[in-house]
């Protein structure tokens, strides 16, 4: 199964020095994105890749440069999460899969993959809501994972925003 892996340019350099050729031999295409990249055309190869039946892997919890985002409820705080993976799923009809990697006490790594889900909108007017709902589902999955494996999720940049006022208040932004 062909895989396209989106990485920040600095991470690509690390991968290149170690494994780029081996990854390519195994059907993994590496796409390096620069933090200053603003052109939507940079994403076209991923759309075509998904439509051809491939898998595109990109981070769901880190904003890269000027990347677009939606604000969701994360443990009672605002959190800005990328909307790009969810837009890709909406535009292509490809299922969205969330995966988490963690190690156990013996140092063995495990991968947990969510059931695939579709991001659908019957009309153009419903797209924003569908993407927001999908990103909130991802945030809720991330919360569950972090609670189960509190030392396995790391975020090295400011992540939580303002506290959301009312407990149980539905957050819609």
Predicted regions and their residues:
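Catalytic core of membrane glycerolipid acyltransferases/transacylases, capturing the structured
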Residues: 1-36, 52, 63-73
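Non-catalytic C-terminal accessory region of glycerolipid acyltransferases
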Residues: 25-26, 39-173
């Amino acid at each position: 199964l062909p895989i396209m892996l989106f990485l920040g340019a600095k991470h690509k350099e690390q991968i290149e020095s170690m494994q780029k050729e081996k990854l390519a031999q195994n059907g993994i295409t590496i796409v390096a994105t620069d933090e200053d990249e603003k052109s939507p055309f940079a994403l076209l190869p991923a759309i075509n890749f998904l439509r051809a039946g491939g898998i595109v892997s990109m981070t769901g919890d880190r904003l890269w440069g000027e990347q677009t985002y939606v604000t969701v409820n994360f443990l009672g705080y605002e959190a800005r999460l990328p909307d790009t993976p969810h837009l890709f799923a909406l535009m292509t009809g490809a299922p969205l899969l969330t995966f988490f990697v963690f190690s156990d006490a013996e140092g063995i790594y495990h991968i947990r993959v969510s059931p695939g889900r579709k991001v659908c909108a019957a009309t153009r007017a419903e797209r924003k809501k569908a993407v927001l709902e999908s990103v909130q589902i991802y945030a809720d999955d991330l919360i569950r994972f972090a609670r189960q494996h509190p030392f396995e999720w790391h975020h090295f940049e400011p992540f939580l925003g303002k506290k959301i006022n009312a407990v149980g208040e539905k957050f819609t932004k």
